[in-house]
């Protein structure tokens, strides 16, 4: 009898754990899918769709620039990037986690992009990113914080450049 009770308890416990894990996996997959769709929107240079993935109170922390804390400032960052004729971008999530509450998650991954530098020369870049997402009341995920930086070494000023100022 004790064996039956133990087996039943273990079976129910494992079943409950599987249900919990399946829910988390489903939420993580939904977040991964949202991030992948966002990457496709940016790759197709669709400004409106790209910016639509941000929450109303989002903050973007681009490298070597001030934080963008308004929708207009975020739109300007993307507008400037997408306007470059040589601009190509893609990113892929390598880690996705959703809080137990189910309404907050983060994505980290890698990106590749090409765009023109100040002289018009195409520059290839690759790096990593982190996004913090919020699940809204309508069930859609929106990015509340977005930051990225390059894996490439920072370029050094030309010798004597500081002295010429």
List where the protein language model places each region:
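Glycine-rich beta-strand-turn "strand-cap" elements at beta-sheet edges
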Residues: 92-101, 147-152, 160-164
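Short, low-complexity N-terminal intrinsically disordered segments enriched in polar/charged residues
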Residues: 4, 8-12, 18-56, 155-165
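A solvent-exposed, acidic/Ser-Thr-rich amphipathic alpha-helical stretch
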Residues: 28-32, 47-102, 108-110, 115, ...
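Short, acidic, Ser/Thr-enriched surface-loop or helix-capping motifs
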Residues: 55, 117, 136-138
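A short acidic/glycine-rich loop-to-helix N-cap element
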Residues: 118-123, 153-159
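Short beta-strand edge/turn micro-motifs at domain boundaries
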Residues: 126-154
């Amino acid at each position: 009898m004790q064996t039956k009770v133990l087996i039943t308890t273990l079976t129910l416990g494992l079943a409950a754990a599987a249900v919990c894990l399946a829910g988390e996996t489903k939420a993580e997959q939904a977040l991964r899918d949202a991030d992948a769709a966002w990457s496709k929107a940016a790759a197709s240079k669709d400004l409106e769709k790209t910016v639509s993935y941000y929450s109303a109170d989002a903050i973007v922390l681009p490298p070597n620039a001030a934080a963008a804390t308004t929708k207009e400032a975020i739109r300007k960052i993307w507008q400037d990037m997408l306007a470059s004729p040589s601009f190509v971008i893609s990113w892929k999530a390598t880690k996705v986690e959703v809080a137990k509450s189910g309404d907050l998650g983060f994505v980290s991954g890698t990106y590749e992009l090409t765009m023109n530098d100040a002289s018009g020369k195409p520059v290839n870049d690759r790096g990593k990113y982190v996004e913090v997402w919020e699940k809204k009341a309508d069930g859609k995920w929106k990015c509340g914080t977005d930051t990225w930086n390059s894996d490439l070494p920072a370029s050094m000023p030309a010798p004597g450049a500081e002295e010429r100022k």
